[in-house]
Amino acid sequence: WIMGHMVNKIEQINEFLDLGANSIEVDIAFDELGYPEYTYHGVPCDCKRYCTKSEKIDDFIEALSAATTPGNPKFRKELTLVVFDLKTGGFDASRMYKSGKAFAELIQFSYWKGSDDAGRAYIVLSLPKLDHYEFIKAFREHFDTSTFKNLLEERVGYDFSGNEDMGLTRVVLNKAGVNDREHVWQGDGITNCILRSLDRVKAAVAIRDSATGYINKVYFWTIQAYSSVSDALNAEVDGIMTNEPDVIANVLKEDAFKDRFRLATYRDNPWETFKR
């Protein structure tokens, strides 16, 4: 998956897809009570990027639903996966459960439109800290008595992006009600302004490939330098988050990679661990 980073304006959806992305990351900002309010990253962010682009949450989710609904004039078949980078550090932790419920309602009614036929992209809920796990728990429990529980079970995955201990990550996911390998993505990375080793990525890949692991997919963020992309691919990641999707697309065409990797399509299940 080529994961377009910090896609927070409606027009950026097509911009990043046109550059070769098949996935986007969207930053979700919340009000002080934990209700989703708008798309926004804020400073600091990445080098050579504007950090303050924003949309009202309802407007962006409406556009995102259109872009991922077959038959809609704005449908883009390339967009198969959306990572919601949930900025849950801006409100009191006591509101985490209610915030997860509110976001579940937003997805059910504004993205899925209360229908099995709208908003087909797979979703990854990405939390910045392990102690925010009640957001995931609440999101899942919202659908326990819903007729749309099948969409939760088919289309929603989970990630913690804070580069915390992976053994503890497994424990916390289980506390949130997520079983081992139940749609678990594991990210590792840092702003593109700073070089980061692949040590933790390689550890995550080893867990993914272990018979007793809990991870389905591993991704690295945020890179676009040719050497960094090559190194990440050689480490066997499943996704790369980037500001320049065309760079990753071009690297995938190189002789060293063209027979080992291909761009994921909607037929590729992001919850299945790939076996070579």
From Swiss-Prot:
Needed cofactors: Mg(2+)
Protein's UniProt keywords contain Secreted: yes
SUPFAM superfamilies, per the entry: PLC-like phosphodiesterases
Residues at the active site: 5, 41 (nucleophile)
Keyword terms, alphabetized: Cytolysis, Dermonecrotic toxin, Disulfide bond, Hemolysis, Lipid degradation, Lipid metabolism, Lyase, Magnesium, Metal-binding, Secreted, Toxin
Tissue specificity of this protein: Expressed by the venom gland.
Residue sites binding Mg(2+) per the record: 25, 27, 85
InterPro entries associated with the record: PLC-like_Pdiesterase_TIM-brl
Protein's cellular compartments: Secreted
CDD domains in alphabetical order: GDPD_like_SMaseD_PLD
Catalytic activity entry: an N-(acyl)-sphingosylphosphocholine = an N-(acyl)-sphingosyl-1,3-cyclic phosphate + choline; an N-(acyl)-sphingosylphosphoethanolamine = an N-(acyl)-sphingosyl-1,3-cyclic phosphate + ethanolamine; a 1-acyl-sn-glycero-3-phosphocholine = a 1-acyl-sn-glycero-2,3-cyclic phosphate + choline; a 1-acyl-sn-glycero-3-phosphoethanolamine = a 1-acyl-sn-glycero-2,3-cyclic phosphate + ethanolamine
Functional note: Dermonecrotic toxins cleave the phosphodiester linkage between the phosphate and headgroup of certain phospholipids (sphingolipid and lysolipid substrates), forming an alcohol (often choline) and a cyclic phosphate. This toxin acts on sphingomyelin (SM). It may also act on ceramide phosphoethanolamine (CPE), lysophosphatidylcholine (LPC) and lysophosphatidylethanolamine (LPE), but not on lysophosphatidylserine (LPS), and lysophosphatidylglycerol (LPG). It acts by transphosphatidylation, releasing exclusively cyclic phosphate products as second products.
Entry's family note: Belongs to the arthropod phospholipase D family. Class II subfamily.
The name this protein goes by in its record: Dermonecrotic toxin LlSicTox-alphaIV2ii
Origin species: Loxosceles laeta (South American recluse spider)
